Regions:
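Sec-dependent N-terminal signal peptides of Gram-positive bacterial secreted proteins and lipoproteins
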Residues: 7-29
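Extracytoplasmic soluble-region selector
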Residues: 29-112
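Short, solvent-exposed loop/linker segments at the N-terminal edge
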Residues: 44-50, 126-131, 223-226
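Strand-loop-strand motifs at the edges of beta-sheets in extracellular beta-sandwich domains
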Residues: 78-90, 133-137, 228-235
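Exposed beta-strand face motif in extracellular beta-rich ectodomains
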Residues: 90-94, 149, 244
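Terminal connector regions
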Residues: 185-229, 281-297
Length: 297
């Protein structure tokens, strides 16, 4: 009887061990199998006119020849390869079926980026020092993302004939504005019969797209005199490598713009970069600089 009980205990032990081995060997595979099929994104925020391509992966392999569907084709449509096109402000669900299971990506479409960008040309006051610059362009970005704005300014003569065009890209951080300095020298139309033309400028917005922000900070030192000049040191810093053009606008005690200059700065990550800005001591009263604003673009 004792031998029989011992035999039963041995059999139970062997069975338990076998079950433990099966759990160790099989269960992780089942868990992995349940997790390895997934969409590249389950939530996407797009702006009208933008595209995004969804992918479905089975493990590390991309699944092809799928049938994608949109719950609201007026807001966002999707083609046979999973490319989403944002059409109108609203919400939509992009669905794909694979191995009898549905996978869903929630899409939020916001207004077109261009709808929230404004721009204008501003004359620089004649009594303000501006070097070769005679215009400022103010670009306002009311989007909740940083944008790259492509703007053209066409120049015409007094009779409306085209002279030249200047096209530039400007980066404007979210919910802010920049002021860039523009150079438009007056010139001659006909070299054989020189005729001065009056400037007529027409500005147009070509495109707006999302981009990385310009994360540059700056500190301006108190003015100091050196060899007949008044200087200020501008120290730039950034947590990541950044480079940008910048406009410096100086105002007097009455709030009038008295001096504008431009520059370029390259800032390595977590380093301090110093620029020295100065003018002759004879212009101290003329400029009467009490406030300085710097705009990066």
């Amino acid at each position: 009887m004792k031998k029989l009980n011992k035999m039963k205990n041995v059999i139970k032990l062997v069975l338990c061990f076998a079950m433990l081995i099966s759990v160790i060997q099989i269960s992780p595979q089942n868990v992995y199998a349940a997790k390895k099929i997934k969409l590249s994104k389950t939530k996407v925020i797009l702006y009208v006119g933008e595209n995004y391509c969804l992918d479905l992966y089975d493990g590390k392999s991309q699944v092809l020849d799928l049938k994608w569907k949109s719950s609201n084709k007026n807001v966002a449509k999707v083609n046979e390869i999973g490319n989403i096109k944002a059409l109108k402000k609203g919400k939509a669900k992009i669905t794909v079926k694979y191995k009898n299971k549905k996978y869903v990506c929630n899409v939020i479409v916001k207004d077109a980026l261009k709808n929230h960008v404004s721009y204008e040309l501003i004359d620089i006051p004649e009594n303000a020092y501006s070097g070769q610059y005679n215009k400022m362009i103010k670009i306002v970005n009311n989007n909740d993302v940083t944008v790259n704005v492509n703007i053209s300014i066409k120049q015409y003569d007094k009779d409306g004939f085209y002279i030249r065009q200047n096209t530039n890209d400007y980066i404007v951080n979210k919910n802010t504005y920049i002021i860039a300095l523009m150079e438009y020298d007056k010139g001659l139309i006909d070299f054989n019969n020189p005729i001065q033309y009056d400037e007529q400028l027409k500005i147009s917005l070509n495109s707006v797209r999302k981009t990385d922000s310009i994360d540059i900070e700056y500190n301006i030192s108190d003015p100091y005199i050196d060899n007949g000049w008044i200087y200020r040191d501008i120290v730039f810093t950034s947590p990541t490598v950044k480079s940008a053009k910048y406009s410096t606008l100086c105002y007097n005690s009455s709030g009038e713009l008295t001096r504008v200059v431009t520059g370029y700065v390259y800032v390595p990550a977590n380093e301090k970069v110093k620029k020295k800005d100065g003018y002759n001591l004879n212009f101290k009263d003329k400029y009467d600089i009490q406030k300085i604003n710097i705009y990066f673009y």
